[in-house]
Design a protein with these regions (language model features):
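N-terminal Rossmann NAD(P)H-binding glycine-rich loop of SDR-like oxidoreductase domains
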Residues: 1-22, 250-278
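NAD(P)H-binding glycine-rich loop region in Rossmannoid oxidoreductase-like domains
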Residues: 43-83, 312-354
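Conserved Rossmann-fold NAD(P)-dependent oxidoreductase catalytic core, especially the SDR/UDP-sugar
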Residues: 89-128, 358-402
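Active-site Tyr-X1-5-Lys
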Residues: 128-155, 402-420
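Alpha-helical substrate-binding/gating segment
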Residues: 160-167, 178-201, 419-420
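Conserved C-terminal active-site "lid" loop/helix of NAD(P)H-dependent oxidoreductases
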Residues: 201-202, 207-230, 237-247
């Protein structure tokens, strides 16, 4: 077995590498390493770099992808880009290279809204919260699930508790989310060898009656996970915790001022004309309106933007820039985001997914309740991975974006960000 491990500077990865059989060769990858890993070949770089990706996949047969769970970069945008575009590129390249299996490390924290009252197992729908440590693994799950659906790359998602070792457990108050690192390693080793195909999800919790998410389907014969650590010696140290609470809803207010992102496209141009008689409109795009007016229409008869007249205004705003988006939303009552990149494999994710994150962050920061986010029809995927075989398609069935056009999966990730 030739194993690639991303997020390899983590406690879980380091403990796994030490436990692997001698006949397994390991290539450990992360943005940086805090200390050397003498028992593995180490590479530093980013999964968004396609040249780096091609190099680290050479001769690899299996992948354990822990980067969305552990790797954080200079800012939120870079971390999200690595978790979304990086995971998407990794899975596609792995499928093309003939990798036999990919394991994704994710988190059981998705079920925090439920675990006070319910025993959530693998059949329950996750409830991720809008924080980076949940968005990154959740969006990686979404990206890899769609790649697995189309390419048949065997992909196992292991949602883990909070991985700790003996030293951490001895020096901290007991937390019911804990998962002993040795049990996490045992689950990963099991994931490398069990019979599986397509996309599968397993919940990897601790042993004992106190754990937040008890072992369910992962403990059945098909996967055979048997945790050994219940932290019983630390139960008495458990501190009181507040029950999960949803954020306070943003109150509604009259909508008089509207900011539009992506106003230079045909949809944005038509929208500006419709909004102008009724609202004060701030139109934004990545280029000045005069420059966009000089570009031929996207199709015959498609509308072009025109310079707005007072009290309306045009601002040059790049949705990839969180500070610019935040400033553009100041004083606004509603947001319409029609920004889009359809073909560029880099900016499709940076605009359609990370840009959506910037817009929603700005909406929350400014107390804007109404956000309109546009996206494509995602139900026309051809072949067995889509709904090509059916004729009765309703609006709320799960999307099937495929993987051949970056426009669709990147927009799906943006929609997930907005939903969360």
């Amino acid at each position: 077995m030739h194993l690639l491990i991303t997020g390899a500077d983590s406690l879980l990865a380091r403990t796994l590498i030490a436990a692997l059989p001698a006949d397994v060769t390991v290539r450990a990858v992360d943005a940086a390493f805090s200390t050397p890993l003498p028992s593995a070949e180490t590479r530093t770089g980013h999964l968004c770099d396609t040249a780096f990706l091609a190099a680290i996949l050479a001769d690899i047969t299996h992948i354990i992808h822990l980067a969305p769970l552990y790797t954080r970069l200079a800012d939120d945008n870079a971390s999200l880009d690595e978790a979304t575009r990086g995971s998407y590129q990794l899975a596609n390249a792995a499928a093309a290279a003939g990798v036999q299996r990919l394991l994704l490390g994710s988190t059981l924290d998705f079920f925090a809204p439920l675990w006070e009252h319910f025993r959530a197992d693998e059949s329950w729908r996750p409830r991720p919260q809008p924080v980076l440590d949940q968005l990154c693994p959740w969006l990686a799950e979404v990206a890899l699930r769609e790649v697995a659906r189309v390419t048949n790359l065997t992909t196992l998602c292991l949602r883990l508790g909070e991985v700790v070792d003996d030293a951490h457990a001895a020096s901290h108050a007991y937390d019911r989310r804990w998962l002993h690192v040795k049990d996490g390693v045992a689950a990963l080793l099991r994931g490398l060898e069990v019979e599986a195909e397509g996309w599968r999800v397993w919940h990897i919790g601790a042993a004992g009656e106190r754990t937040r998410v008890p072992v369910a389907q992962a403990g059945e014969e098909a996967f055979g996970y048997r945790p050994r650590h219940d932290f019983a010696g630390r139960w008495a140290s458990e501190a009181a915790t507040s029950p999960f609470q949803l954020p306070t809803p943003i109150p509604a207010r009259p909508i008089r001022k509207v900011v539009v992102f992506g106003a230079g496209g045909p949809l944005g141009a038509a929208l500006a004309e419709e909004l102008a008689p009724h609202y004060t409109v701030r139109l934004t795009d990545v280029k000045p309106v005069e420059e966009l007016m000089a570009i031929p229409p996207q199709s015959p008869g498609a509308p072009l933007p025109v310079p707005p007249q007072s009290p309306h205004e045009w601002r040059v705003v790049d949705v990839r820039d969180a500070a610019q988006v935040h400033a553009a939303c100041a004083g606004m009552d509603a947001i319409v985001n029609v920004s889009v990149v359809r073909h560029d494999p880099v900016d499709a994710f940076r605009v359609n997914a990370v840009g959506a994150y910037n817009v929603m962050q700005a909406a929350v920061a400014h107390g804007i309740q109404r956000v309109v986010h546009t996206g494509p029809f995602m139900l026309g995927q051809r072949g067995g991975a889509g709904y090509d075989w059916d004729t009765f398609l309703v609006d709320d069935i799960p999307p099937r974006p495929g993987v051949w056009w970056v426009y669709l999966p990147s927009k799906l990730l943006g929609q997930e960000i907005c939903r969360i």
